[in-house]
A protein has these predicted regions:
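Sec-dependent signal peptide cleavage junction
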Residues: 16-35
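Bacterial Sec-dependent N-terminal signal peptides
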Residues: 1-9
Length: 502
């Protein structure tokens, strides 16, 4: 299933591109080597194979040798906006010689603060837990000959820091015995001043249950919340922070689309729940200029059409959730109960963590041009309204789509509707976080769950950092995880995605 590749691949590649095949022993890296890779990879030197137009051919000599060269780390940096008033994030590249690298020591102001691996378990907990469970299973219970890669962690987050204070960091590789390798590399970074905080409750936002249907009363509350959150954003001073506070008694903040501006942080500590009414998400978003299907904008957006004046310096952070309200719970075409009760942890597979209460994953129905009419929530509403607004079909036909509760009812209701109309209706589904033409973006720690369409779209932007973002969208149709279309200078590390698509 895709989530296995995502959990491991994102955790590794997002640690600034560090994946080494069978190059670190179990004792050194804390992760296994496998006999499976010995068939293809020399333990000492990679035999790199290059493809050309006519097939494959072996190079005359290896492109690199992990047993030679400098033991110094390289490219130590603080990614874009990966710092605030109390924390600073670091990333780096592994040394040229890395055959004996097991971990990295990190010093703060001359004192050893810890290692990259231990820090990763705290600051990228989902990626770390699924990596640990995966490797544990396939080296003890599963097929030990399965091809796996060793993952080197090239990141560290310092927390509990003081505002408006400069810190000096040094990072150095260590071997399995803790011996330092090479010369420590140094970087300085200052935390920000303490930000002015604007709580959306102070602007009139109210907590309710998570709506999966709507009427006039619910619409009024949703529109009140949307206006309150937008008012807080509009009032936010430069460098300020708009906070969606933690919820109480399982309640959430239900909202329509909101729009961020330059020089601000949106800190989501509670749940921002997307309205089930698709009218609260303006139609007009084109994924790419050459697309013809017009979609709804996201729950949270940062966008300008003025390419010479991009949205700048935007952070989206917090311990909470952007919840898309897109699909009912289920597996494929089989609904879980009424489709509205969470099935978190009910669909485990070999290699998943055994503690499903903490680490269990939800699963959503698969979707499709016709299935959306009984499997969808917000996704159903947008498709239904598109067809209604075409004016091509009588009210009874449209109403039968809205009230379909089974595959048979949806199929019967869709009979007589053109395939093109069904396709374009389905395409109107909105996403969760959309950023376009932005410069200097940081997205960290939040959970993105159950989008109608895509999870995160960062498009036509530059200088982007994402870390410890959890995406739960499996097996909803599309449900893309972290998307960076036509963007530059992107650094991702420690993210976890369980997606039904990219």
């Amino acid at each position: 299933r895709f989530r296995k590749a995502a959990a491991l691949g994102l955790a590794a590649l997002m640690a600034v591109g560090s994946v080494n095949f069978a190059g670190v022993t179990t004792g050194a890296a804390g992760l296994p080597t496998t006999d499976g890779h010995d068939k293809y990879v020399n333990k000492n030197v990679f035999d790199v194979i290059s493809s050309d137009t006519f097939g494959t051919k072996e190079l005359e000599s290896p492109l690199f040798d992990k047993t030679k060269g400098s033991s110094d780390i390289t490219d130590l940096q603080v990614p874009t906006l990966a710092y605030d008033e109390s924390s600073i994030g670091l990333v780096w590249q592994k040394p040229e010689k890395y055959d004996n690298v097991a971990d990295y020591n990190v010093y703060i102001n001359g004192k050893l603060a810890g290692t990259a691996r231990e820090n990763y378990k705290v600051n990228a907990a989902w990626a770390a837990k699924y990596m640990e469970s995966f490797y544990d299973y396939y080296t003890t219970q599963g097929n030990s000959d399965v091809d796996m890669v060793n993952v080197d962690i090239h990141a560290y987050r310092a927390t509990g820091l003081q505002p408006d204070t400069e810190y000096t960091f040094k990072v150095v590789a260590i071997d399995k015995d803790g011996k330092e390798l090479g010369t420590p590399q140094e970087i300085k970074q200052k935390t920000t001043a303490k930000a002015e905080v604007l709580n959306i409750k102070d602007f009139g936002a109210v907590e309710t249950e998570g709506y999966t249907s709507y009427d006039d009363e619910k619409n009024a509350i949703i529109e009140k919340n949307t206006k309150a959150i937008q008012a807080a954003i509009d009032a936010c001073p430069e460098g300020g922070k708009v906070v969606i506070p933690e919820n109480t008694d399982g309640k959430v903040f239900v909202s329509g689309a909101v729009w961020l501006k330059s020089d601000m942080t949106l800190e989501v500590n509670g749940t921002l729940w997307a309205s089930p009414n698709s009218d609260h998400f303006e139609i007009g978003f084109l994924m790419y200029p050459f697309y013809t299907d017009t979609r709804g904008w996201g729950l949270v957006n940062a966008m300008t059409s003025d390419e010479s004046n991009p949205i700048k310096n935007v952070r989206v952070t917090g311990t909470g959730t952007l919840y898309g309200n897109g699909w009912k719970y289920g597996a494929g075409s089989t609904m879980y109960g009424d489709g509205l009760t969470s099935n978190k942890g009910k669909n485990t597979q070999a290699g998943d963590p055994t503690d499903t209460e903490t680490w269990g994953l939800p699963r959503y129905m698969g979707g499709g041009n016709v299935n959306v009419f009984y499997q969808g929530i917000q996704s159903k509403d947008s498709a239904y309204k598109y067809l209604k607004n075409t004016g091509k079909y009588d009210d009874a036909k449209i109403e039968s789509l809205r009230t379909a509760t089974t595959a048979a009812e949806a199929t019967a209701a869709a009979n007589g509707i053109s395939k093109d109309d069904l396709k374009f209706a389905y395409a109107t589904r909105s996403s969760l976080l959309i950023m376009r033409n932005c410069e200097n973006v940081y997205v960290g720690d939040i959970t993105i769950e159950n989008p109608s369409n895509h999870s995160v779209n960062i498009l036509d932007s530059r200088n982007i950092a994402t870390t410890n973002v959890k995406v739960f969208s499996y097996d909803g149709n599309n449900g893309d995880g972290l998307g960076y279309g036509c963007s530059q200078n992107v650094i991702c590390w420690g993210n976890f995605t369980d997606t039904g698509d990219d």
